[in-house]
Amino acid sequence: MSHANLMEVARYRVTFADCDLMRIMYFGSYPRLFEIGRAELFRRLGHPFPEYIARGLYLAVVETSCRYRKPARYDDELVIAAAVTDVRRARLSIVYEVKGPDGDVLATATTVHAVLDESSRPQRIPHEFREAALGNITGTDKREGSPTRP
């Protein structure tokens, strides 16, 4: 996966609890990395999750795909990069890349999210987030100090 607007959003050190009997990071541990990446991406776009929760909006994961390329090992420091790739009326897609200490890509993933209210009804993506997400997609974010604007 090569996405021009992927940005490093977090680092994570693999713990013993993340590993399986083969002493590598268990495949089921990766979705937590995507959650960390997603939360930090939103924060960097100026829209931290607590703001949405306060408005009664939630991002439900409706689809996840992951390609595991190389294993992560205990105590490796991983780099998580993420980018918004698609924004629709009540859905959005995010891509992720997890790199190991040597810079090799260990995993790539995509998650698709529905914006829901507290009753699980679909809701429009708020205009201000839509604009920030579209800026991430195109690399034209206009906010001062934004990660897509030097």
Predicted regions and their residues:
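Catalytic strand-loop segment that frames the active site of acyl-thioester-processing enzymes
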Residues: 1-47, 150
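Short, basic/aromatic beta-hairpin or loop at an interaction surface
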Residues: 52-59
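Active-site beta-strand->loop segment that positions catalytic residues and contacts the acyl thioester
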Residues: 62-77, 83-89
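Hydrophobic aliphatic residue packing
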Residues: 14, 24-25, 61-62, 80, ...
